[in-house]
Amino acid sequence: SGGNRYFPNSGVSSLGHAIPAAIGARFADTASTWAIIGDGGFQMCCMELMTAVNYDIPLNVVLFNNATMGLIRKNQTQQYERRFIDCDFVNPDYAALAQSFGIGYRRVADARDLEALFAQDDLTGAINLIEIPLDKDAFPNYLSKR
């Protein structure tokens, strides 16, 4: 069936899956393609942006930046009394990284930035890195309630 699709990677591990999967999806369908990824997973596959550049594959990457391995931190919060081991890290300057790849970069710090992003910017036909900073201790609630 037509329409929009969202293909999450769940069960095995999500780290590093979104960008290569979005590139593959773009080969199958020329519709606007978005990859949604956390900063931990992004650091495992950011070089795949160069694949998109080399093959001129339009792609929008939404990067949630909380400077931590979010699911690991959530687990250590809930099950280990906030004793954090090896989940936090230092991120690169994502604007400089995007510039080094020759791709677009936008930072969305609040709702106004998000509205402006979609109202003013043409996000089609190019490769864009869209960084959204998040609080490292704000965890999503999943349907499984875990």
Where are the language model's segments positioned?
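Thiamine diphosphate
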Residues: 1-146
